[in-house]
Amino acid sequence: MTKPHDFKTKAIIVRKTKCGEADRILSLLTPDLGLIQGFAKSVRKTKSKLSGHLELLCYSEVSLARGKAIDTITGSQTIQSFLNIRNSLQLSAMAFYACELAYHFSPEEAANPAMFQLLLSTLEELDNGSQPELCLKYFEINLLASSGYKPELRECANCHKKLQATINYYSPESGGVICPNCRNTQIGMPVSVNTVKVLRYIQENSFSSICRLKINREILSELELAIRANIRFVLEKEPKALLWLDSLRLADL
């Protein structure tokens, strides 16, 4: 989509970088333009009228002026600030992690309405306090799908035979779950029958449906190991926000 000289867009602030003494460069995830960068002049000054509308996690309507190298933010109005998330360290860590993933999985200026809606819905559900751990798993699995990395969960990702109700293996390198026979030639971590069922259910249903799931700690742990391995394989690195999230989880034990 071609941007006019002056334009408005709804956006979620997914990243901010200091620039100079008082400026910032913001990464904005939008429904119609994809991921775009915006220069926010003097936004770090205490008297800036824009600062409160351009914080990380803010869902805002942003006005920009097109520039040669980077667009300049000329105005912003908050639509939703997710106060419940901001008032909880655990929810904040989860939300920052989701924003970091959205940033890394979104190519610049390539519209992906599904990605935008997924992140917005995830922030709304986290803010509502609806099963935060499951909410994050829903986000991660559907993030992979909306980015072209949808894991194969119904048939072996290597030999393409229907998966049997037995211990199978999750292999990011192969693109999903592989059968025991293919485990001899491919790298994979064991996943139980119930874990594969939960993965399928999350991948194929709405968040309102998965909220009703009752998942024990063992299955949740298997889910986390498999999905994290998949994300790490795609990004070729560990998301930074996971360090904070994991430290909070350990402190809560």
Curated annotation (Swiss-Prot):
Matches recorded under Pfam families: RecO_C, RecO_N
Biological process annotations from GO: DNA recombination; double-strand break repair
Q: Which UniProt keywords apply?
A: DNA damage, DNA recombination, DNA repair
Cell division among the record's keywords?
no
Where does the source fall among the domains of life?
Bacteria
List the GO terms this entry assigns under cellular component, sorted alphabetically: bacterial nucleoid
- TM regions (residue ranges): none
Has the keyword DNA repair been applied to this entry? yes
Q: Its biological function?
A: Involved in DNA repair and RecF pathway recombination.
Please report which protein family the annotation says this sequence is part of.
Answer: Belongs to the RecO family.
State the protein's name: DNA repair protein RecO
Encoding gene, per UniProt annotation: recO
